[in-house]
From Swiss-Prot:
It comes from Leptospira biflexa serovar Patoc (strain Patoc 1 / ATCC 23582 / Paris). ATP binds at residues 10-11, 18, 89-91, 99, 124-130. This is Phosphopantetheine adenylyltransferase. The keyword Isomerase does not apply. One of its GO terms (molecular function) is pantetheine-phosphate adenylyltransferase activity. It is found in: Cytoplasm. The gene is coaD.
Length: 160
């Protein structure tokens, strides 16, 4: 069976922290699906289509990387894609508490699916999509926290 990892998230926007997790996980799997979650109950800065397009540009030319969208439970999406691994990044203890609880529920729902946690590199341990949006909204540079294509999109969004 092909080793496929699903890296789910809203990625609104995609950050260098997300990129670092993918870069480090890339050699470990035959395929990584970056699964952009669609949550109609949340107001997003970027549409799912915009997020997929930006992430696609970030990973242009990379082998083994696919970008997709999904709604519903991550474990159901994993089953649909024949993946037995959910990939998650952890920045701090607060991330661990939240992610651990979700991984336990996922294990109850789908015992065959494992959650793999990668610790954030120190350089990215403070970076979050929420913080990046807030800083960019106030006209400050976020170029060290996001890939270039995302930084350009943020400038366009907030310079209207």
């Amino acid at each position: 069976m092909k080793s496929i990892a699903v890296y789910p998230g809203s990625f609104d926007p995609f950050t260098n922290g997300h990129l670092d997790i993918i870069r480090r996980a890339h050699p470990l799997f035959e395929e990584i699906i970056i699964a952009v979650a669609i949550n109609s109950k949340k107001t997003s800065l970027f549409s799912p289509e915009e997020r997929v397009e930006m992430i696609g540009k970030v990973f242009h030319g990379w082998d083994k990387i696919k970008i997709d969208t999904f709604e519903g439970l991550t474990v159901d999406y994993c089953k649909e894609k024949n993946s037995r691994v959910i990939l998650r990044g952890l920045r701090a203890v607060t991330d661990f508490d939240y992610e651990y609880a979700i991984s336990l529920m996922n294990k109850k729902l789908a015992p065959e699916i494992e959650t793999y946690f990668l610790m954030a590199d120190n350089e990215y341990s403070f970076v979050s999509s929420t913080i990046v949006k807030e800083v960019a909204r106030h006209g400050r540079a976020v170029s060290n926290q996001v890939p270039d294509v995302v930084g350009e999109a943020l400038v366009k969004k907030f310079s209207v």
